[in-house]
UniProtKB/Swiss-Prot annotation:
Species name: Plasmodium falciparum (isolate 3D7)
Basic and acidic residues bias (residue ranges): 1-12, 27-36, 112-131
Coiled-coil blocks: 100-134, 166-242, 281-310
Region span, Disordered: 1-43, 112-158
Protein's name according to its UniProt entry: Coiled-coil domain-containing protein PF3D7_1144200
Superkingdom to which the source organism belongs: Eukaryota
Biased composition annotated in UniProt, kind: Low complexity: 132-150
Length: 319
């Protein structure tokens, strides 16, 4: 019995192991497949993340470049619109250089220093010239005064003897001038004076004409502007009137459509019915009185007809 029991136990263990192997084998296959899929997914995700990072970095670089370009464009437009900056840009830039706002102060200071240096050099040169002239004049004045005085007297005497008179681009000595020459000179001066006066008159006339023309032109321009303004105002008023008429016509059409709509018609009928009921309720007693009077009249007519019939029968019996 014990051997049989042990054998049975061994068989049970073997069967259990086989069943476990059978059940575990598909599980292991599934695990292997999952592991492969996971490994492939992990590798794909790594490369995908790497690609995304590169893409993001490229986009960031593009955005930064666009921002810098836009800033440069804005700076250039500001420089073009500002007259002072545009002049500085023309003077400071060459064919291949670009104007830098950061170097503006340095360039100004350099320009000022150069100007100051030039001024100082000019002052020094002038001072040197003045000193040299003063020394030369002193040397001249230290010469013999007697000779200088004699030379001055001689020059004055010669100048008085050789005074010349110019007329029509010709020179004459005062002592040798005749009356004819003086008449010619007076005639020439009169002609020149008359010409000057005529020129002045002509210029005045021309200026007056120009002023008149300008005034007329200004008046015409003002009149044209007034007419233009009046035309614009008339056009605006016409447009306003047309808009008002159009709006009023649209409102009337909307009202008509509302009146013709089924809801509005139902409301109207309801109102009429309510009015009729109110009238009927208020005049109910009067209607009953009229009916009673009508019934009495009917009875009276019936009686009269009966009497007429009786009279006709009596007349017929007498015949």
């Amino acid at each position: 019995m014990s051997e049989e029991h042990s054998n049975d136990h061994i068989e049970d263990v073997v069967l259990c192991s086989q069943n476990c192997d059978e059940t575990n084998s598909p599980k292991n296959e599934k695990d292997e497949k999952d592991f492969k899929n996971f490994s492939s997914e992990s590798s794909d995700s790594y490369y995908k993340n790497k690609f995304r990072l590169k893409k993001n970095s490229i986009e960031i670089k593009k955005k930064s470049l666009l921002k810098s370009k836009l800033k440069n464009d804005d700076i250039q437009t500001i420089i073009k619109n500002d007259p002072i900056l545009s002049k500085l840009n023309k003077t400071m830039t060459t064919d291949d250089e670009i104007f830098d706002l950061a170097n503006k102060k340095e360039n100004k200071t350099k320009f000022k220093l150069e100007k100051e240096k030039e001024k100082n050099e000019k002052k020094e040169k002038k001072e040197k010239k003045v000193t040299n002239d003063s020394t030369n004049n002193k040397n001249k004045n230290n010469s013999v005064p007697f000779l200088n005085e004699n030379q001055e007297n001689k020059n004055q005497h010669n100048h008085n003897n050789k005074i010349k008179y110019e007329l029509n681009e010709q020179t004459y000595d005062i002592n040798n001038i005749s009356e004819e020459i003086l008449k010619k000179e007076n005639h020439h001066t009169n002609i020149e004076y008359n010409e000057k006066v005529q020129d002045q008159d002509n210029t005045l006339n021309i200026n007056q004409k120009v002023n008149k023309i300008q005034l007329n032109s200004t008046k015409k321009q003002k009149q044209k502007e007034k007419t233009k303004k009046e035309i614009k105002l008339n056009e605006q008023n016409e447009i306003k009137k047309n808009n008002q008429n159009f709006n009023s016509s649209i409102l009337n059409e909307i009202k008509k459509n509302k009146e013709l709509s089924p809801l509005s018609l139902i409301k109207k009928h309801g109102r009429l019915i309510n009015n009729i009921e109110e009238i009927y309720n208020s005049n109910c007693e009067q209607i009953q009185n009229v009916r009673d009077e009508f019934a009495e009249l009917k009875n009276d007519l019936n009686k009269i007809m009966n009497l007429i019939n009786i009279g006709q029968k009596a007349v017929a019996s007498l015949k």
